[in-house]
Amino acid sequence: MSSESSTGPEMSATTKQMLARVRQMVPPMLEKFHKGQLGRVAVIGGSEDYTGAPYFSAMASARLGADLSHVICTPNAAQVIKTYSPNLMVHPLMRSSPPALSSSDSGSSPSRTKSAPDTDPSQIAAQIIPMLDRLHVLVIGPGLGRDPLMQETCAKVITAAREKGIPMVLDADALLLVTKDPSLIKGYDNAVLTPNVVEFGRLTKALGVDEEVEKAEETAGETAKVEALAKALGGVMVVQKGAKDYLSDGKVTLTVDLKGGLKRSGGQGDTLTGSIATFLGWRRAYLEDLWDHGHKLNKEELIGLAVFGGSAITRECSRLAFAKKGRSLQASDLTDEVHTAFLNLFGEVDAKL
């Protein structure tokens, strides 16, 4: 199955043109840069039951080229994630709800119960929010789970990050927060949502556009669903994943038609969130004029280009990994293909010493 991996990716002329634009926001490798300028990303997620997802997201971000990649998770998850890679900075700042005490445990000593700082979402968030000033991008949701304390803490961090104008990629159970309270991100054009099919349906129902979305594809074409949801969210960028990826903020819609692999193993979406995060970090570097790029891209199009780049990288990783592994493909196989996917799609920007 390796013959296909040796050939280049198949794409339309439009996709090729879009990738050429994305490439303009990829920083060259320059001696003058210092650590942290080309992307400081943090993944908030990771719980006792889910340690792989935040790792895959953070590693995709790092492998693609972010300078610093953090994971903010629970202590139990941190112990595990630290064994996966020494390249990630892992912060055990999140807390899950304490187990409910039975009536026979009501007289338990304080040592058997969690202290107030471990059960108050405001106090937990207060340990995380000061980190935001040192970060460029947040990924929220991989491995988060539905624990109420974790969810409430994330809601407070999202609010603080929005106030600071930090770009955010929301996935998995972070989307449950949006479903319950769309105002968390509604109208925030630095937010990106990456729902799967089920999550997409929940979001449309929560926004009251489920019937509109149901009819949209029949009457207005295949991109109408994602456009309707993005408009309902007030301009938030939404990724509708599928045989093709459709990306829309309700005004501009992009289609990523690169061929991907055929295996749908869990965890591939984590490569997507991490890849988008790195491109969003590069967006900041582009806006800060860290290198001479000629200002050929408009600020308004950079979020879309970043998401396009992340989607393209993920689909190419999937194609390469499937060509090698076939039906045995796992999420970790995509992680191993990130650099090759980047070279296939963008080549390497010339280094200048």
UniProtKB/Swiss-Prot annotation:
Bias kind Low complexity: ranges: 96-114
Entry binding sites for ATP: 241-245, 260-269
This enzyme's EC code(s): 4.2.1.93
Keyword Protease applies: no
Domain YjeF C-terminal stretches: 18-345
Keywords, in A-Z order: ATP-binding, Cytoplasm, Lyase, NAD, NADP, Nucleotide-binding, Phosphoprotein
GO molecular function: ATP binding; ATP-dependent NAD(P)H-hydrate dehydratase activity
PANTHER family, sorted: ATP-DEPENDENT (S)-NAD(P)H-HYDRATE DEHYDRATASE, ATP-DEPENDENT (S)-NAD(P)H-HYDRATE DEHYDRATASE FAMILY MEMBER
Name the UniProt record assigns to this protein: ATP-dependent (S)-NAD(P)H-hydrate dehydratase
Organism: Neurospora crassa (strain ATCC 24698 / 74-OR23-1A / CBS 708.71 / DSM 1257 / FGSC 987)
